[in-house]
Amino acid sequence: MAVAVRALQEQLEKAKESLKNVDENIRKLTGRDPNDVRPIQARLLALSGPGGGRGRGSLLLRRGFSDSGGGPPAKQRDLEGAVSRLGGERRTRRESRQESDPEDDDVKKPALQSSVVATSKERTRDLIQDQNMDEKGKQRNRRIFGLLMGTLQKFKQESTVATERQKRRQEIEQKLEVQAEEERKQVENERRELFEERRAKQTELRLLEQKVELAQLQEEWNEHNAKIIKYIRTKTKPHLFYIPGRMCPATQKLIEESQRKMNALFEGRRIEFAEQINKMEARPRRQSMKEKEHQVVRNEEQKAEQEEGKVAQREEELEETGNQHNDVEVEEAGEEEEKEAGIVHSDAEKEQEEEEQKQEMEVKTEEEAEVREGEKQQDSQPEEVMDVLEMVESVKHVIAEQEVMETNQVESIEPSENETSKELEPEMEFDVEPDKECKSLSPGKENINSQEVEKESEEKEEKEEKEPEPQPEPVAQPQPPPQPLPQSQPHSQPHSQPQPVLQSQPLCQPETLPLAVLQPPPQVIQEQGNLLPERKDFPLESIKLPEVSVEPVLTVHSENKSKNKTRSRSRGRARNKTSKSRSRSSSSSSSSSSSTSSSSGSSSSSGSSSSRSSSSSSSSTSGSSSRDSSSSTSSSSESRSRSRGRGHNRDRKHRRSMDRKRRDTSGLERSHKSSKGGSSRDRKGSKDKSSRPDRKRSISESSRSGKRSSRSERDRKSDRKDKRR
């Protein structure tokens, strides 16, 4: 411990010497010793005088000095204020005027005219003439003018020289000021640093002094404990130290134990002392580190200020002298600005390029999407073409079947004008009701549908001319045998109701029915032996016939006859006006209708009144079915063209598959139902009634085999009938 104390004392002496050096440096800078502390009271007295600070004491001192010094008397303050002073001045002026007025009244001054008088023009002209005439005056004027010009030039030169000198002087003064400021800053920095060093040294001295004191105390404590170790310490507190007069083994053990305990205490105390000294050393280190950081920051600030001052000086020098360095710096600055502008421009160009790339990508994606849509449309176009071809084929099949039905009906019955004139009346009776219903529901569609039917008939005739050998097609037989009136109505209704409808459109009139083919009854199917397999396999489509209320017609009204005849004549005239081909098609259709009516008339003449009504109802249903089939083709084509315009290609495919399935199922159901209906009718009918259809069948077969007329003869007859009408 003695060694540690000596080392600390040596450090303390060194610190004191360094502190003395710092004080000497401060004395050199400031001119006074920092250790000389002046008393505060003396400072205050020197500053403020006996009054003790600012206030009335200083004023009293000043007044005393002014009064005693023999100088000018001090100005006395007017306590009344400025207004009173102004008023006093006015009063003094008035008094002075009053005193001077009587003197002026006594001595009357003479009135003098003004000395400023306008000179006459004649006199000035004379003077000018005199001056021009004198040569001496001219010379004198020239001399004076020359002197004036010379003096002015001299003044000008002197002024320019003075300005240059003033500029130089200003430059020198500015430089001196800058140098003085720099020196002053340096002095301040040195002074600050010295004072900071002084403070740091003082803190170090204090710490060293504390360490020395602690070390001395530790040494004293160690010396004291070294003496105590020789004694036995009691276990109880306060501890007592004793030594027995004679040592025994028990006391020897106690001495050893007490020495162990005391040594442990000494070790603990030494460790604590060392830790405390380390802590004391760490505190000034931290403070010194903080001070160093502050110094570094201050030095940086000073350097920045100096650089700013130098830059300002350079700028001023360059502006005043106009050296080449200014141009070089300006060029460098311009190059730097150009570089920065180039960098900014390059950044902007990069951004523009990125935007352009994004736009190009978007345009490419849009073009790809358009190409895909075009491919899809092209793929859908052949599907539409296939749909159109299928429609045309289906329409051809239906038209051919209609022609076969008409030809068979015409061939089965002999065309006679008398029978047609007689039997036209019941047919027109039955046709009036559906026409009325159609007009009430859709009167605007008759003309359109009639034109479409005429166009289709023209296409038929062209195809017939191109194809000389028509294919053999199934022959449609007339409908099942007629039965009495009470049973005819319920049988006609089940035929129309159970048949499923393929199209989802609302059927308001018979012209807008779907494509359909009349299914012959089972008895007729058995008799037809010359049917082709193609026609048997053809899928049969259902028909929704308009339900016509069939009533017994025993008396025919003349009014209905005239109305129906006029309608048929007007239609025939319109068709004759359009074209000859259309008139031919219309005449063929009218002849077929007349033939059907004549067949119904022949059957009705053989039976009673009830059988007549049933046969007429069957003929009307057959006629209406033929009309429905013709109109259904046009309506189906219209509906499909509309759906094609809407672009529901996928829906069409799905519907076609579903329609084909339904047609197959509906054809089977109809065959079963027709067979069931025929069997039920046979059971319900009596033996007498069942004999009548057998007669009719024999008549129709004989007429078929014996009497067949060519199409040309039929066309001629129809033309003659149209001309007669």
UniProtKB/Swiss-Prot annotation:
Assigned GO CC terms: cytoplasm; desmosome; nuclear speck; spliceosomal complex
Domain of life from the UniProt record: Eukaryota
Cross-link (Glycyl lysine isopeptide (Lys-Gly) (interchain with G-Cter in SUMO1)): K156
Compositionally biased tracts (Pro residues): 471-487
Modified residues (N6-acetyllysine): K237
Any Pfam family matching the protein: Pinin_SDK_N
Composition bias, Low complexity: 488-518, 584-638
Compositionally biased intervals (Basic and acidic residues): 87-100, 120-138, 278-315, 340-349, 358-378, 452-469, 661-672, 679-699, 710-725
Localization in the cell: Nucleus speckle; Cell junction, Desmosome
Region of interest: Disordered: 46-138, 278-521, 545-725
N6-succinyllysine sites (modified residues): K237
Keyword Phosphoprotein: yes
Protein name according to UniProt: Pinin
Gene: Pnn
